[in-house]
A protein has these predicted regions:
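The feature marks long extracellular or luminal low-complexity segments
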Residues: 2-5, 18-294
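Bacterial N-terminal signal peptides
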Residues: 7-16
Length: 294
């Protein structure tokens, strides 16, 4: 009789364990938003432990089977793939779910180069990476606004839709030299990091309409440029090299002069018949012919 009772008890225990193992079921959303609370429903009875394994951390929750489990925002701030494991009655049950980035809240902005000539097309590049408030890259399309201004006057503006969290653009430099403010921003976002400013120094481009005049003195031919400016009217910086070249029967003479207050001056050897030219970089200016009577 004892053996019969023992056998029945063993069967009952095994049946109960099997029931408990099957009863320890749970359900959760397939996808949630980073930093948002949500609930996990369970079935069965007894105690158990729910473990969440995420990209940045692991959290552990004691549960009463049959009750809902509240998952706090702190447990799901990192976007990515999560594994939820429910341990109860000596058995484990696992499921996966995904945490998606929240709405755009901040961005990282890179601008290149730091120095560009004024009045040039597509010389300034900007790339922005969009993140939510928990530093997750926002893969969903969002809008980034790029603005370029010099001296408080806006010279260019455009909106770019991100692709895989990245927005990229090229901008024309402004027509005037100075410190250009290159700004990337997230429309509607209030975080301080939703607007990032970079400074791009715009300098005068190459010389334009380079012209000179020449005058004979007792000891030399004195050459002098008109004010040297680029095609947008910006003065070339002091120190820019201007090259004067004299060609006559004796050969070639070359003098490099630095611009000072918009003008470059130099002295060339006296000659009875010379051709004098001027250049700055790859830009050629006018040519003069000096004879003995001039």
């Amino acid at each position: 009789m004892r053996r019969v009772i023992l056998a029945l008890l063993t069967i009952a225990v095994c049946w109960f364990a099997s029931y408990a193992a099957h009863a320890a079921e749970f359900n959760l959303p397939k996808q949630v938003t980073a930093g948002k609370e949500f609930s996990v429903t369970t079935s069965g009875s007894g105690d158990g432990v729910l473990v969440l394994i995420g990209p940045r951390a692991i959290s552990r929750h004691k549960v009463k089977l049959g009750d809902a489990i509240s998952i706090s925002d702190e447990d799901v701030r990192a976007a990515g793939r999560y594994i939820a494991v429910l341990r109860a009655g000596g058995e484990s049950n696992s499921k996966t779910f995904f945490v998606a980035a929240g709405k755009p809240g901040k961005l990282t902005f890179l601008a290149r180069p730091s120095r560009v000539p004024a009045g040039k097309q597509d010389v300034i590049s900007g790339v922005a990476f969009v993140f939510d408030q928990y530093d997750n890259l926002v893969l969903a399309p969002s809008e980034v606004k790029f603005d370029l201004s010099v001296g408080g006057k806006q010279s260019a503006s455009r909106a770019v839709t991100t692709k895989n969290g990245i927005a990229w653009t090229r901008m024309n430099s402004g027509s005037t030299q100075g410190a250009a403010q290159f700004v990337a921003s997230l429309p509607g976002a209030e975080d301080e990091e939703a607007t990032v400013r970079r400074v791009v120094q715009q300098v005068a481009a190459e010389a334009c309409n380079l012209r000179m005049k020449a005058q004979r003195t007792e000891r030399a031919i004195v050459v002098e440029t008109e004010p040297v400016k680029d095609c947008s009217g910006n003065s070339l910086p002091d120190g820019t090299i201007v090259t004067f070249t004299e060609v006559d029967s004796a050969g070639r003479s070359t003098v490099d002069a630095r611009i000072k207050r918009d003008i470059a001056r130099a002295e060339l050897p006296l000659s009875d018949n010379a051709a004098i030219s001027v250049a700055s970089g790859v830009v050629l200016g006018n040519e003069l012919h000096m004879g003995s009577g001039k």
